[in-house]
């Protein structure tokens, strides 16, 4: 039942995304003030994704092996903590987590940017909704975390023992907070560029998102390094493995971007570099998500 609710919530969330796009385009063209219906629908979108994610967690906790994702990545004897963290210890669950953070961050962006230019807020929302809709469709069509198995197995295959570690259990959510933060920076930069809105005021506004993303990405990489040190036996915290490097690249781009944002906040220069680095950070974050 939890899986069924989760799947339908995912579909309702996609439908709400299309409604948000419709009202956003209408508001962008015709009105001088921000339409509060857009914020309400964005909140509703977030709620549907929360329900969907909770549905997957409940399926893991209850060892619902009619769910293919649960069957492939859980077992009745696994401790409760790892049943919960097993939710994102797989491709489908991790993408659903991505989507959850995406919808949370765009909601926070709208709540925290009320003093910004209306068209800038709406255009940022539209760019972000394109990404969100892409994740909805990808999850529903190709990486459905709620796929059904029949006949229902009595037991699951279990979670990879390497993943049954406290550091790695919290590593993906923290890393994804950094990754997804780069999407807000990306959408906001495209919006500001399109509207010729890049300024010192804008730099001060977006600096918070850059800082937040950098902090989470740094913590995520640090936790992954600690785990690799004692779990994989590489003999060090960093082995220049492709899995490590793929998270390092957006971190380097984000670190550079942060310095350019600090300069832009004081003087209107290096705008081209800010645009290039914003796009690069998000692109590298997407590569890091789908490559690992």
Spans of model-derived segments:
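Polytopic transmembrane helical bundles with strong interfacial aromatic enrichment
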Residues: 1-292
């Amino acid at each position: 039942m939890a899986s069924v609710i989760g799947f339908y919530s995912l579909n309702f969330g996609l439908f709400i995304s299309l409604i948000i796009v419709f009202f956003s385009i209408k508001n962008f063209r015709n009105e001088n003030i921000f339409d509060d219906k857009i914020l309400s629908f964005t909140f509703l979108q977030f709620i549907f994704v929360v329900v969907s994610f909770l549905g997957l967690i409940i399926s893991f906790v209850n060892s619902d092996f009619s769910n293919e994702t649960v069957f492939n990545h859980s077992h009745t004897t696994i401790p409760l903590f790892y049943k919960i963290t097993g939710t994102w210890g797989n491709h489908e669950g991790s993408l659903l987590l991505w989507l959850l953070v995406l919808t949370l961050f765009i909601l926070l962006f709208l709540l925290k940017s009320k003093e910004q230019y209306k068209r800038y807020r709406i255009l940022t929302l539209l760019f972000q909704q394109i990404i969100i809709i892409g994740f909805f469709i990808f999850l529903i069509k190709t990486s459905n975390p709620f796929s059904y198995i029949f006949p229902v197995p009595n037991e699951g295959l279990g979670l990879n023992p390497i993943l049954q570690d406290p550091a790695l259990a919290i590593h993906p959510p923290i890393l994804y907070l950094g990754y997804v933060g780069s999407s807000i920076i990306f959408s906001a930069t495209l919006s500001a560029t399109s509207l010729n809105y890049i300024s010192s005021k804008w730099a001060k506004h977006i600096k918070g998102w850059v800082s937040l993303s950098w902090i989470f990405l740094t913590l995520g990489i640090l936790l992954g390094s600690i785990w690799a040190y004692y779990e994989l036996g590489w003999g060090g915290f960093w082995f220049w493995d492709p899995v490590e490097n793929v998270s390092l690249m957006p971190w380097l781009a984000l670190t550079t971007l942060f310095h350019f944002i600090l300069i832009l906040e004081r003087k209107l220069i290096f705008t081209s570099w800010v645009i290039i680095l914003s796009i690069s950070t998000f692109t590298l974050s997407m590569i890091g998500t789908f490559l690992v």
